[in-house]
Amino acid sequence: MRLYNKACLFALVILFSGYAYMSCTHKDALVSTNGPKIERGTHKLNFITDPKVSFDKQHSNVGWETAYLGGLSLLTGRFDTLGMTSFNFDESNAAGISFEAWVWVNRVNTSEPARDKGCLQTTYGVTTSMTTEAANIAIIKSKSVELSTDDNGYIVKFDLTFHGVTKELTGKLLYDGTIVTGSGATAKNVYGFTFTFQFLAKTDFGIVSTNIADLVGIKCNAIFRQTQ
């Protein structure tokens, strides 16, 4: 009888040990992950070296936002005069992506003419009569680009030149897709891109104002057209 009891006890120990091992290995399998599946195409774009590509300024824009009085609801605006010096894009190759763009600072537009042509001109250190003077131009110029590991975007290190200061920042570039317009001889590929970043206007660029927060967000939307 004792021998029978010992045999049963031994069998139970073996069963329990096997169950515990299988449970542990099953849990370990659940922990592992391969991350998001990121797919990239083969689209390429070269402005201004490709004569078939043009920058569609009418449907592009540069907007900004910052907390009013440093901590309230957002004060927003845009720049009415902007341009693209160059833009190169290779969807699957980060080394083939680079760009340079600019805005005229004195063409700020918050839908309040008195503010736009008054206190903001003083804050930026410009006048309404300026055009291509260095003090009136804010420039972004890419330095390096990496493929994002979270989505199909691109992480961009770039220089922002503004208010007499040049500082390296990091932003996010998104390829918004391509749509074909027209047909036959008038057919065009229309490309869309979004570039977003933030900067410290007071700390890094010497802006003096109690009306805005230090942190300013920028969103650039760019459209290009390519004849087929």
Q: Predicted regions: what is each one?
A:
Residues 1-10:
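Bacterial N-terminal signal peptides that target proteins for export
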Residues 25-228:
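Low-complexity, acidic/polar, glycine-enriched regions of mature
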Residues 9-17:
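Gram-negative bacterial Sec-dependent N-terminal signal peptides
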Residues 19-23:
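C-terminal motif of bacterial Sec signal peptides marking the signal peptidase cleavage site
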